[in-house]
UniProtKB/Swiss-Prot annotation:
Residues 350-402 are annotated as: Disordered. One of its GO terms (biological process) is mismatch repair. InterPro entries: DNA_mismatch_repair_CS, DNA_mismatch_repair_MutL, DNA_mismatch_S5_2-like, HATPase_C_sf, MutL/Mlh/PMS, MutL/Mlh/Pms-like, MutL_C, MutL_C_dimsub. Keywords: DNA damage, DNA repair. Disulfide bonds: none annotated. Belongs to the DNA mismatch repair MutL/HexB family. This is DNA mismatch repair protein MutL. It comes from Wolbachia sp. subsp. Brugia malayi (strain TRS). Pfam families: DNA_mis_repair (PF01119), HATPase_c_3 (PF13589), MutL_C (PF08676). Residues 356-368 have a biased composition (Polar residues). HAMAP family: DNA_mis_repair (MF_00149). The gene is mutL. Residues 369-393 have a biased composition (Basic and acidic residues).
Length: 628
């Protein structure tokens, strides 16, 4: 077959395939143009998910009459010159959007430039100009109508999703652009449904709370800077998380981007607080010198290349860890509202119109609820053996909680050996009042289902998951100890490791496990002898614990720093070494646990990311009973 030169019409349609993939692509390109034009209000209207009609109206600088036809030519732009290619500051710069949209739709653009006496309109259909420029009634800015998207390339329609899914994709685009451009007002209307409207704001946080209300009461501020790179934004406490990453918003120099490096750094910062299959809520803005970043990677302009990836990763990781290291890590899950008590799921999209079918199987904010494995759940709920019911000793004196965590007791068979025997007397009424009024977790009133502690604090009720709470205490105590005391087993335990990979893990980490309190000797090709275990664990099932540790070692990524690998092993040890659901506790024990939670970092979540406690404000309880 002979080689031929493609005509302009065909070239434009091929190019449009990269730029315009779906209706949301049209919205993205045209709204970005409106932002670059200096608009203060942008209105978007769609019909049939954007396939039948998309209109964008702005009050920006507009386009001169003499430039209207030129604007539809490929690679025609007012935003870029040769000298600016390495310092791109606008959202749009390739000059492909209008020509690509015109190639696959029927488009009409009307605009009135600043200082012009009247507006003018131009139309294209399938890439060809229709008629001449005509006058148009428009006070200021630009109005664009895109009809019958992909009529010229009907095969593309087969690859579109449902109408609701396309609407959701458009909403995601608008949310992203509205988030970072908080000084601009945005309105999105789908058919006759109630509009999604964002008023002009004076700060990113104000806009953030408009888009996702979970940030209102659960936000941690981020502010980090190094070598001319600045990171700002907000993240949510670990107890607010979900099963997919759609609540992670990342921006670079005001441009919404999707970058695995940033997501990886965010997930690393949270890895000690939420399960591996959960994602946090985060909105981060990186300001980077323009000559240190390349945004000209893909026609959709959502990908970038960083000159110094290591620096970017470290700034994000460090900034988030600093925020998560504040005492807010001890906070409870947000208050339980009335709708939750009635079992009504809270929508997370913030949409006035229904897009539920496109949300997948995990529509709702999890607030720390993880998908536990069967073995983890069985371990969590296992009934204690008789030895676990033995009370260990800890003083309930005023000095408790003021010592360094590594010197303090954690409780019971799984804890450091101190006594509760001095706390046998009933707490006096005045002491109860002091605890309720002056301590965040208040005074324990009772235990229900031998699993949850009910405590009264000032103006609120606290419900504590005893296993989850104690697991975090044991874990943090283990992490802070430079050397862990060992206890010799009365009878050494022989443990069979059923696969060769597991035995290799034991050999590789044998010395590190010794530092953690385990004296392990390899007996044969598939058996090891455990002679000593960490004293903090008390009486446990040694075989089950070692097998769990080996399984965990095989799951750990090789690229993780050794400190992270150690912490993951310690988390497994802590899970085995903490009190179980089903363990009966005395009132004195409950209150010691509450005091230690108040003094322990990150006590708001267990090692798997579950909440350790929740709170209900008195005002919310009164609303449940219609007293308010």
């Amino acid at each position: 077959m002979a080689i031929i030169l493609l005509d302009t019409k065909t070239i434009n349609r091929i190019a449009a395939g990269e730029v315009i993939e779906r209706p949301a692509s049209v919205v993205k390109e045209l709204v970005e143009n409106a932002i670059d034009a200096g608009s203060s209000e942008i209105e978007i209207k769609i019909e049939s998910g954007g396939c039948n009609l998309i209109t964008i109206t702005d009050d920006g600088g507009g386009i001169e009459k003499s430039d209207l036809e030129l604007a539809f030519m490929r690679h025609a732009t007012s935003k870029l010159s040769d000298s600016e290619l390495i310092e791109i500051k606008h959202l749009g710069f390739r000059g492909e959007a209008l020509s690509s949209i015109a190639a696959v739709s029927r488009i009409k653009l009307s605009s009135k430039a600043n200082g012009a006496s009247e507006a003018w309109s131009i139309s294209y259909e399938g890439g060809e100009k229709i008629g001449e420029l005509i006058p148009y009634s428009l006070p200021q800015g630009t109005h664009i109508e895109v009809r019958d998207l992909f009529f010229a390339t009907p095969n593309r329609l087969k690859f579109l999703k449902t109408e609701r899914a396309e609407i959701q994709s458009i909403v995601d685009i608008v949310n992203n652009l509205a988030m970072i451009n908080y000084s601009i007002g945005f309105t999105l209307t789908s058919g006759s449904k109630k509009p999604l409207k964002y008023a002009k704001q004076t700060s990113l946080f104000s806009r953030l709370c408009e888009v996702e209300e979970e940030f209102q009461d659960n936000s941690l501020e981020i502010n980090e800077e190094e070598d001319g790179v600045r990171l700002t934004g907000h993240i949510c406490k670990p107890t607010v998380n979900r099963g997919k990453s759609d609540m992670i918003y990342t921006f670079v120099n005001g441009r919404p981007i999707k970058d695995n490096l940033l997501v990886s750094a965010i997930r690393y910062a949270y890895h000690d607080f939420i399960p591996s299959n959960r994602y946090p809520f985060a909105t981060l803005h990186l300001e980077i010198p323009y000559d240190q970043i390349d945004v000209n990677v893909h026609p959709n302009k959502s990908e970038v290349r960083f000159q110094n990836k290591r620096l970017i990763y470290e700034i994000v990781r460090r900034g988030l860890i600093k925020a998560l290291s504040t005492r807010t890590g001890n906070s409870a899950v947000s208050n339980i509202d009335r709708s939750r008590c009635q079992g009504i799921g809270k929508e997370t999209s913030g949409l006035p119109f229904d897009v539920s079918e496109s949300q997948g199987n995990d529509n709702h904010i999890n607030n720390g609820k993880s998908r536990e494995t069967k073995s983890e759940r069985e371990l969590y709920e296992r009934r204690p053996n008789p030895f676990e019911n033995r009370l260990m000793k800890e003083s309930n004196s005023p000095s408790v909680g003021k010592k360094d965590l590594s010197e303090r007791s954690v409780l019971f068979d799984s804890g450091i050996q101190k006594s509760l025997s001095q706390a046998k007397t009933v707490v006096l009424e005045r002491e109860q009042i002091d605890l309720i009024e002056n301590h965040p977790l208040g005074f324990a009133r009772c235990q229900v289902y031998n699993t949850y502690i009910i405590a009264e604090a000032r103006g609120k009720l606290i419900i504590v998951d005893q296993h989850a709470a104690h697991e975090r205490l044991v874990y943090e105590c283990l992490k802070q100890k430079s050397s862990i005391k060992r206890q010799k087993l009365l009878l050494s335990e022989v443990v069979e490791i059923k696969n060769q990979a597991g035995m290799e893990m034991v050999e590789v980490y044998k010395d590190k496990l010794f530092e953690m309190g385990f004296d392990i000797q390899i007996n044969s090709e598939n058996k090891v002898i455990v002679k000593e275990i960490p004293a903090i664990l008390g009486t446990i099932d040694v075989k089950e614990m070692l097998i769990d540790i080996v399984d965990r070692l095989m799951e750990i990524e090789d690229m993780l720093p050794i400190e992270d690998k150690v912490n993951k092993i310690l988390a497994t040890i802590a899970c085995h070494g903490s009190i179980r659901a089903g363990r009966t506790m005395k009132l004195e024990e409950m209150n010691v646990l509450l005091r230690q939670m108040e003094e322990t970092p990150y006590s708001g979540q267990c090692n798997h990311g579950r909440p350790t406690h929740i709170e209900m404000k008195l005002s919310d309880i009164e609303k449940l009973f219609e007293r308010r």
